């Protein structure tokens, strides 16, 4: 048995989740960890690996202006720009491992830096920056109304809204999320050639100006229990179109978030829980 592990690398990790959106978190600050997409896929397998929606790497900051660097990989091994639920778990990991004693930290990402503020032991507030409604090349889309776009599917044109929260989102307003064909439409839109890097697709049911329900198809993954950046994107669309107030409770399959946005020219905030499940190690 000892010979089996002789040429393998031991990796310590934590299993965490935010509203059942689950993560494998690895501390890479003192020990550089390189994982290929093939290895990440194997680790993400819920039957033969650890099992997770995303892998989060905690890295040393490359700048004096930020405290840490935050990297995110989907279960298929692709590195992505943003994960809101992951950001809260990233912050809790830093606290639990004694890597910071600050009440507020600034972390760098593949795109824009994020501010993480610790409100209570497991309730965390993240500054997700200002939503970007102008990041798409819209030449291939028909502008139906202000920030309403028509995407041609197999049998119909679907009205949606496009916004970036550091990663791309397509928001569809529905009367009820209960019977929404999340995986069918989500997969169809994600594979549309107008989104060469894919897109996260969310179905939003507005209950009132302070409360929405949301189901999310995450690119390269499928429907997930929760997606923090999707909650931010949906609320941003609702506020921009004056359908929602500046503080909104978002009900996802995995739990609830609070999203706060005062409007254009200001940052958007996400408030929600993070949970540590267990620590472990694996040989690869």
Curated annotation (Swiss-Prot):
Superkingdom of the source species: Bacteria
Q: Where in the cell is it found?
A: Cytoplasm
A Pfam family reported for this protein in Swiss-Prot or TrEMBL: DAP_epimerase
Q: Which Gene3D superfamilies match?
A: Diaminopimelate Epimerase, Chain A, domain 1 (3.10.310.10)
Site note Important for dimerization applies to 278
Q: Which UniProt keywords apply?
A: Amino-acid biosynthesis, Cytoplasm, Isomerase, Lysine biosynthesis
The entry marks the following residues as binding substrate, namely 21, 54, 74, 84-85, 167, 200, 218-219, 228-229
Active site (UniProt):
83, 227
Site Could be important to modulate the pK values of the two catalytic cysteine residues — annotated at 169, 218
**Which reactions appear under catalytic activity for this entry?**
(2S,6S)-2,6-diaminopimelate = meso-2,6-diaminopimelate
Q: Which InterPro entries match?
A: DAP_epimerase_AS (IPR018510), DAP_epimerase_DapF (IPR001653)
What sort of enzyme, by top EC class, is this? Answer: isomerase
Q: Which GO terms describe its biological process?
A: lysine biosynthetic process via diaminopimelate
**GO function term, MF aspect, one:** diaminopimelate epimerase activity
What PANTHER family does the record tag this protein with?
A: DIAMINOPIMELATE EPIMERASE, DIAMINOPIMELATE EPIMERASE, CHLOROPLASTIC
Q: What is this protein called?
A: Diaminopimelate epimerase
- Organism of origin is Buchnera aphidicola subsp. Acyrthosiphon pisum (strain 5A)
Q: What is the lineage of its organism?
A: Bacteria, Pseudomonadati, Pseudomonadota, Gammaproteobacteria, Enterobacterales
């Amino acid at each position: 048995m000892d010979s089996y592990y002789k040429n393998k690398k031991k990796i310590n990790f934590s299993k965490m989740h935010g509203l059942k959106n689950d993560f494998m978190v690895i501390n890479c600050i003192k020990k550089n960890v390189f994982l290929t997409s093939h290895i990440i896929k194997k680790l993400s397998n819920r039957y033969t690996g650890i099992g997770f929606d995303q892998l989060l790497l905690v890295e040393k900051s490359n700048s004096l202006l930020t405290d840490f660097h935050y990297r995110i990989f989907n279960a298929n091994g692709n590195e992505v720009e943003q994960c809101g639920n992951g950001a809260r778990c990233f912050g809790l990991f830093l606290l639990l491992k004694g890597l910071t004693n600050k009440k507020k930290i600034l972390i760098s990402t593949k795109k824009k830096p994020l501010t993480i503020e610790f409100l209570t032991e497991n309730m965390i507030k993240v500054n997700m920056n200002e939503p970007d409604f102008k990041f798409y090349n819209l030449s291939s889309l028909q502008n139906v109304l202000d920030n309403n776009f028509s995407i041609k599917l197999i049998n119909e044109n679907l009205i949606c809204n496009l916004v970036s929260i550091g990663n791309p989102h397509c928001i569809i307003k529905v009367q009820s999320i209960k019977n929404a064909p999340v995986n069918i439409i989500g997969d169809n839109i994600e594979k549309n050639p107008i989104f060469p890097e894919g897109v996260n697709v969310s179905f939003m049911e507005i209950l009132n100006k302070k409360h929405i329900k949301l189901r999310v198809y995450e690119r390269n993954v499928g429907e997930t229990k929760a997606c923090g950046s999707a909650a931010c994107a949906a609320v941003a669309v609702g506020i921009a179109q004056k359908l929602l107030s500046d503080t909104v409770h978002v009900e996802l399959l995995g739990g609830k978030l609070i999203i706060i946005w005062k409007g254009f020219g200001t940052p958007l905030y996400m408030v929600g829980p993070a949970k540590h499940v267990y620590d472990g190690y694996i040989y690869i």
